[in-house]
Amino acid sequence: MKTIWLLLATCIHVFAHDELYILIDEVSLYNCRGVKNEITVKEEDVQIVNERGNRVYYIRAPGNYSLDFKKIKVKQNFGFLAGEIGVTLQVPVLEGPAGIRFDLPYTMVPETTLLSQKCDDFSGVIERNGRTYCRYCDLCHVSQAVENELASGRHQFLSQSENDTPISKCYNIESNEYDFRRTIQLPSRSQLEGLIRSKAQGIDDEIKKRLNKGRGRFQVFLNLITSDKPAISLNRWMAGSKDCECCFNRNAPHCDSLSYLYCNMEDCKTGWALQCLHKSAKVAACYTVEFNYRMTTSYSDVLEFLRENNYPNQDSQYTQPNQPLVPTTRRPVTPSFEARQANQLQMTQACVESMPSRMTHLKRYCTIFWNEKLCCEHCPDIC
């Protein structure tokens, strides 16, 4: 949750006001290929709601909003949970004729620097199928630690709400259907800018210029891992590692005064992440959540956005005088998520297979980050 709001904040530059509107163009949920999900959730059951419980189509900062997951179906009993997360930001670096955009994928989680990648204090970098993730070996312990950190911090991100789902247990989760809601208090634009300066130091100046356009897309890759036995803690693993013990305890008998200074904590966390799980560990669920959004400080842009999509105005009390009301007609019926996902996957595979073999980079790009305008130009008979 913390990651999502910080990523949205990354695109903020210098605005004239201390208010900000984030227009949610689309939120999509995809299953990972080759994974049989033991935890299922439908796209329409993943929503952002306001304090009155209404689904929101734009976010007004500052303000309180809740991430609402309904009808999470756990198909079988689970033991201990671990998780992996990777976040890729699609930065528009060039826009050509007919709206064709060439996007630069930038990995934000793990945080990418010129020489390396790194995760936070609770996770280590792992790689699978050419993609990097931050692995949290004890997901429930981390969730509580992060929530405590945010709730007690200066920005008070996690607000207390009577509708929030209490964290009652972190292991031996029974097969059932669950709902989950967590309230987030989004601060003002100036406060978010301060967070950017302290958190987004891995982004170079050129990419920051591109981000200031106010429109973007980012993908969140999530893997949930379950095992019969708990993971090894970071402290326990480091205490038993000859190469990393001095990172954990600089006063250990064989650690001299320089051992701690030359200790590579990121390498040690990566080593721990690769070995922390019990041999019974398996992937229980794998999803990609994709966010397409744009930002503005103009309320008239918000009204236009609502009209274009036939969305109701979730916060009518914020409507400015003499502004026409937004139509509340229902949106046209669209195919189910499963049908759209199956059709999209078939079209993607057919399009990539029809491309000439010399287009290696484009084929790889379209396989990972499907861009209909760009990819379909090279397979018009398919699209």
Curated annotation (Swiss-Prot):
Location(s), subcellular: Secreted
Signal peptide range in chain numbering: 1-16
Keywords: Glycoprotein, Secreted, Signal
Top-level taxon of origin: Eukaryota
Carbohydrate attachment residues: N64
GO cellular component: extracellular region
Tissue specificity remark: Expressed in sheath and socket glial cells in both the amphid and phasmid ciliated sensory neurons (at protein level).
Function: Required for the localization of daf-6 to the socket glial channel and the sheath lumen. In association with daf-6, plays a role in dendrite extension and ciliogenesis to ensure the formation of glial channels in amphid and phasmid ciliated sensory neurons.
Subunit and partners: Interacts with daf-6.
The protein, known as: Protein dyf-4
Upper classification of the organism: Eukaryota, Metazoa, Ecdysozoa, Nematoda, Chromadorea
